[in-house]
Amino acid sequence: MCIRDSVPEYFRSMCYINQRIKETGAEVVINFYELLTGLTYALFRPSVPYVCIGHQYLFLHNHFEFPRKSVIQLSMLRFFTRMTSLRASRRLALSFRKMESDRTERISVVPPLLRREATAMQPEQGNYIHGYMVNSGFADSVEAFHALHPEIPVHFFWDKQDADEVTKVDATLSFHQIDDVKFLNRMAGCRAYASTAGFESICEAMYLGKPVLMVPAHIEQDCNAYDARQAGAGIIGESFDLESLLRFAGTYVPNREFIRWVRSCERQIIGELERLADQHSAVTVPTLTNYFPI
């Protein structure tokens, strides 16, 4: 067997990352919560500064409040997050709201990164519930709600294998295969949104002024949901209790400050990169207009 073939795949990947940093003449590396990048910097110690971006870095912030969950699971989550950012010059923590920087952990809190398609949407007040489920088994609770309230239109997206593009149960209940364009269009026109607590979709719902029911599927989403609830995004449930969502929707007030916060995204992140450039004079700050909402 060739020695190269016996080297673990992840180690070869780190060698490749390190080599690409050298070959491209990169002035700064931006890491979006990728473990191998953190390990590459720990092992090979490239001289090029790097910045880590992700909502998970808020879990390392001294003032972040965690839900009452397993201490072991929370510790493992924090450990993994730290491993992705070993020797990082700066950690940019995407957040639902403003927070002070944590100098000890080299954390700067910045607005969420939303895709331009989401920020360009014009929200409308519709009459249907929009949702996304990771596990198609949750369809049972959605169908149970529908049996009691057939007059309320419900559109859920899922990734169920072998299902049709649209599974139409009847005139007011449909399950759709994932499609980014259709998903955002449904989000913009819905009455309320139900989903597992993925950070990005919660942010999109908040930006579009939609009340949210969050059903966390794992420890990271538990933390997302807890933080989002504090920011006024919505309520947390153990199942897709759509009746509770509709009750909450009746009193929900959109967070206008969140919209302003998101719109300051480019300015905030460019500012952080400029501060990094001041420390490393060779770094040229890139224009991010094509990536961040203005």
Spans of features found by a protein language model:
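Donor-nucleotide binding loops and adjacent catalytic segments primarily
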Residues: 109, 113-189
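Nucleotide-sugar donor-binding patch of glycosyltransferase catalytic domains
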Residues: 167-168, 211-255
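C-terminal amphipathic helix plus adjacent low-complexity
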Residues: 247-294
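Active-site-proximal region of nucleotide-activated glycan assembly enzymes
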Residues: 44-109
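Short N-terminal targeting/anchoring amphipathic segment
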Residues: 18-34
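Conserved small/polar residues in nucleotide/adenosyl-binding loops
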Residues: 1-5
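A donor-sugar binding/catalytic signature common to diverse glycosyltransferases
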Residues: 28-33, 185-224
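Short, polar loop motifs at secondary-structure junctions
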Residues: 33-36, 95-99, 156-165
